[in-house]
């Protein structure tokens, strides 16, 4: 019981540390973010189970600090940790049930596994390492294909087990594997590398991805009439990439569970 209480206390310490870290990040005070990371690491706030989280946070902070080599180093560590933590053990799941999800080894969300490759590609672009950046966009495409298979497989399984018949489990119009961001970056990178035919192919895939994406969001279709300019790197000097908003915010819900293990017959046998 003491160990459970201690693990629970640590989870709240980590939550507080994350709040401070993200506040400094929101204020664009990346130097302070770096200092906080080092302090939290020294205090062992990021335990072994939190290494994916630590590496993702580090990768983002160093990216926006223009320390691209350091950023890619931490993103690579995060990607390796995610691969290693793919399978969760039953014992960790039981531990999380008794305390909270912070007991689990954090293996990242699918979107985090994808975006780390996007930011690695962006890290290589200022260094003009187009081939290395293309490796990362190809990794994004591969992961999206695998995620598409996984999600559609889950939808099919749920459809078979759904006895109510009220939910719509059809996935015919959903193409998760078609990433507009990956095709956008690939179009630019192939053009920069002088591979104009592949740049054209990626630009066409980008237009298709945006049309498909419009069926999943309330936003109107993007105007793709000017996208051909992406295939002509000599006609532009500055690439603007903006990321707004934040990921879905997870809120912990505490619940008390009463387990009545009293057995009247065994009690009588005892006496």
Indicate where each model-derived feature is located:
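Residue-level signature for tetratricopeptide repeat
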Residues: 23, 61-62, 123, 189
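Residue signature of alpha-solenoid helical repeat architecture, marking inter-repeat boundaries
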Residues: 11, 47-49, 110-111, 170, ...
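Boundary/linker segments of alpha-helical solenoid repeat arrays
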Residues: 45-51, 81-93, 144-155, 207-227
């Amino acid at each position: 019981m003491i160990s459970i209480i201690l693990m629970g206390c640590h989870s709240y310490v980590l939550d507080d540390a994350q709040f401070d870290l993200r506040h400094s990040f929101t204020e664009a005070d990346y130097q302070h973010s770096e200092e906080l990371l080092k302090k939290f690491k020294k205090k062992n706030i990021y335990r072994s189970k939190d290494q994916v989280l630590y590496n993702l946070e580090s990768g983002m902070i160093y990216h926006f600090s223009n320390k691209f080599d350091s950023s890619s180093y931490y993103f690579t560590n995060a990607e390796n940790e995610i691969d290693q933590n793919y399978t969760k053990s039953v014992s960790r799941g039981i531990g999380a049930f008794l305390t909270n999800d912070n007991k689990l080894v954090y293996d990242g969300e699918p979107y985090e596994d994808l975006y780390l490759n996007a930011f690695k590609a962006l890290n290589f672009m200022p260094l003009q390492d187009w081939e290395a950046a293309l490796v990362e966009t190809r990794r994004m495409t591969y992961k999206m294909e695998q995620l598409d298979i996984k999600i559609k497989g889950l939808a099919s399984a749920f459809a078979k087990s759904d006895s109510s018949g009220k939910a719509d489990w059809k996935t015919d119009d959903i193409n998760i594997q078609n990433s507009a961001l990956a095709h956008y970056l690939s179009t630019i990178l192939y053009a920069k590398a002088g591979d104009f035919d592949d740049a054209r192919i990626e630009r066409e895939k980008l237009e298709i991805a945006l049309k498909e994406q419009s069926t999943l969001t309330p936003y109107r279709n993007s105007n793709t009439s000017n996208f051909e300019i992406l295939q002509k790197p000599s006609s532009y000097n500055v690439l603007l990439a903006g990321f707004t908003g934040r990921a879905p915010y997870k809120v912990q819900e505490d619940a008390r569970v009463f387990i009545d293990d009293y057995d009247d017959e065994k009690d009588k046998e005892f006496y």
